[in-house]
Every structure is written in C-alpha cells, then in structure tokens.
Amino acid sequence: FFADFTGSGTPADFTYLEPLRAPDLTWTLGLTYEWEAGPGLAYVRASAHHIGEHHTSQLNSPTTFNKEQTLVDLSMNYELNNTVFAFFAKNITEEDGFTVGYDVFAGAAWTYAMARKPRTWGISITQTF
C-alpha cells in the first residue's frame, strides 16, 4: 500500500511491511474446576495464552519485535451471593514482550514500546449489583 508514513508529503510504497500485532498463530487454553463450599461456590482457574511472533510498531522496527510467548495465569476464587473473592497470579512465567510499539515521527526521532507487565499477583473482591 502507498502512504505518507514519514511526513514528507509524498506517499511511498510500504507493501513490504507486515501488519502490526498480527501473529500467524494465537491460542488460548483454559481450565476451570468448581465445587460447592459451604454457602458459596469455590473454583480454581488456569489459562495459557500463546501469541506468535509479531511486530508491534507500524514500521516493523526490530527493537519492538515480539518473539513468540505463552502467558500463564492462575486464580483461586470463592463466590458468595454476588461477591467474588479471588487470589490471582498473572504472567507467572514472566514473559517480557511488548504490548504496543510506536514510531515517533515515523521512526526518524525514535521508536519505543510499552512493556508487558511482569509477574503480578494479588487479591481482589468483586461485587455485582
């Protein structure tokens, strides 16, 4: 396709660029096991989300290229009436890819990316009204 990505005022041929954030392969596998526990419902969840290699910036900068990665999340939950208490761990394998990439002034100034969150864990309470 032809576009003026560089701000020169003249469209150029950018057909060689791969689409950003468009891996050839993605998949997700999730498992949930639940059981009645007292007056509520307890359940555990595990999921794995695979993202194939892909570019995160418009101009396919090699500094913002993501190699393939598999994100693994786990949680233990207890649901009582309309409230869910959860202990969770996200990205437990510490995958360190980028979520998005930017080419400032079409890469003439610099290119940068936003890093994926590292391993995170916590407790949450969710109330549904």
Question: Where are the language model's segments positioned?
Answer:
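Gram-negative outer-membrane beta-barrel transporters
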Residues: 1-58, 124-128
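Short, charged/polar low-complexity linear motifs in solvent-exposed/disordered segments
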Residues: 8-11, 61-62, 102-105
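Outer-membrane beta-barrel domain signature
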Residues: 16-20, 60-65, 110-114
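Residues that define the transmembrane beta-barrel architecture of outer-membrane proteins
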Residues: 23-27, 68-72, 117-121
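Generic structural signal for short, solvent-exposed loop/turn connectors between secondary structure elements
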Residues: 38-42, 61-62, 79-85
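C-terminal beta-signal and adjacent terminal beta-strands/loops
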Residues: 49-57, 78-129
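Residue-level recognition of alpha-helix initiation/capping sites
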Residues: 67-68, 78
